[in-house]
Amino acid sequence: MAKKSKIAKERKRQQMVEKYAELRRELKAKGDYEAIRKLPRDSSPTRLTGRCEVTGRPRGYMRQFKMSRIAFREYAHKGQIPGVKKSSW
């Protein structure tokens, strides 16, 4: 389990990105890169890290399921992820 502070910081970044998304889009369309540069750093979507919603783990993150490989494996074995079953060929 990740530290609560790291998870909270990532949530704060996500909110910042959502808050400035429209303004950032407008400035980018105008080509006003100087104004974009003056926006807060955390308002850039590039600074977001994918984190597992179950454990908060930043590594081994699977975007499609929004969870880490470890949590994915655990939930898949229990049959708690719809449409996912163990492969065999």
Curated annotation (Swiss-Prot):
The keyword ATP-binding does not apply. This is Small ribosomal subunit protein uS14A. It comes from the Bacteria. Binds 16S rRNA, required for the assembly of 30S particles and may also be responsible for determining the conformation of the 16S rRNA at the A site. InterPro entries: Ribosomal_uS14, Ribosomal_uS14_bac/plastid, Ribosomal_uS14_CS, Ribosomal_uS14_sf. The gene is rpsN. The keyword Mitochondrion does not apply. Part of the 30S ribosomal subunit. Contacts proteins S3 and S10. GO terms for molecular function: rRNA binding; structural constituent of ribosome. One of its GO terms (cellular component) is cytoplasm. Keywords: Ribonucleoprotein, Ribosomal protein, RNA-binding, rRNA-binding. Pfam families: Ribosomal_S14. Belongs to the universal ribosomal protein uS14 family. GO terms for biological process: translation. PROSITE patterns: RIBOSOMAL_S14 (PS00527).
